[in-house]
From Swiss-Prot:
InterPro entries: EBP, EXPERA. It holds the Pfam family EBP. Expressed in maturing fruits and in juice vesicles. GO terms for cellular component: endoplasmic reticulum; membrane. It is a multi-pass membrane protein. Isomerase involved in the biosynthesis of limonoids triterpene natural products such as limonin, a compound with insecticidal activity responsible for the bitter taste in citrus. Catalyzes the conversion of 7,8-epoxymelianol to isomeliandiol via skeletal rearrangements. Its EC number is 5.3.3.-. The gene is MOI2. This is Isomeliandiol synthase MOI2. Belongs to the EBP family.
């Protein structure tokens, strides 16, 4: 059966179309994300450390980010033939839908496979560790967040650059190009960049304070 992806000559044997509508896929994604956000916000609000709102939002970011890497991207990484799924599996439906904006997920493009493999195995678990570090006020919190954000920013940069170098031909329509490839993909550039700036300032301030104390004593 023919597929909706670009380029049209992409070979996907036994392709099975989505059994769920686009709105249904987005609705389930939204519900799951909101539930995680709600739980983390409530838990962080009861922390004896009296976390700032920024730290609480960062905990949400790392929780959602980590779960996406481990669960959503983990499913894709270990399910090379998700596009054949006939059961209506939620995760298969998500990736069939997202592939309309970037068919490299359906074709298992080596660049995407490498980037997502690192995200699934390393970045996902480390993101949950970053959430824990913020909650407990661990000394490694800022350096861990900076390192993770740098990896996410670098991986997302490669994600976009490799697509551009190959002619930006992987979205089936301009709508999916901008809403999926650009908007959703760009999230992994914007938020990591903002977190890196914040962590950089905090780390530099801590180093200056340490230098000052060293000179005093």
């Amino acid at each position: 059966m023919s597929h909706p992806y670009s380029p049209s000559d992409l070979i996907l044997p036994d392709f099975t179309p989505n059994l769920r509508s686009t709105s249904e896929v987005h609705a389930w994604n939204g519900i799951a994300s909101f539930l995680v956000m709600f739980i983390i916000w409530r838990i962080s609000g009861r922390s004896p450390r009296k976390l700032s709102k920024t730290d609480r939002w960062l905990m949400i970011w790392w929780a959602v980010s980590g779960l996406i890497h481990i669960i959503h991207e983990g499913y894709w990484f270990f399910s090379p033939e998700f596009y054949k799924d006939k059961s209506g599996n939620y995760f298969a439906e998500v990736w069939k839908e997202y592939s309309k904006g970037d068919s490299r997920y359906a074709s298992r493009h080596v660049a995407v496979l490498a980037i997502e493999g690192i995200a699934v195995i390393f970045v996902g678990p480390a993101s949950l560790l970053a959430m824990y570090a913020i909650a407990k006020g661990k000394s490694y919190s800022y350096i861990l967040q900076f390192a993770l954000s740098l990896v996410q920013f670098y991986g997302s940069s490669l994600y976009f650059i490799t697509a551009f170098l190959e002619g930006n031909k992987f979205a089936c329509t301009r709508y999916f190009y901008y809403s999926y490839f650009i908007a959703q993909g760009g999230t992994w550039l914007l938020f990591p960049a903002l977190i890196m700036i914040r962590c950089w300032k905090r780390i530099c301030a801590a180093c200056l304070l340490l230098d000052h104390k060293t000179k005093v004593y």
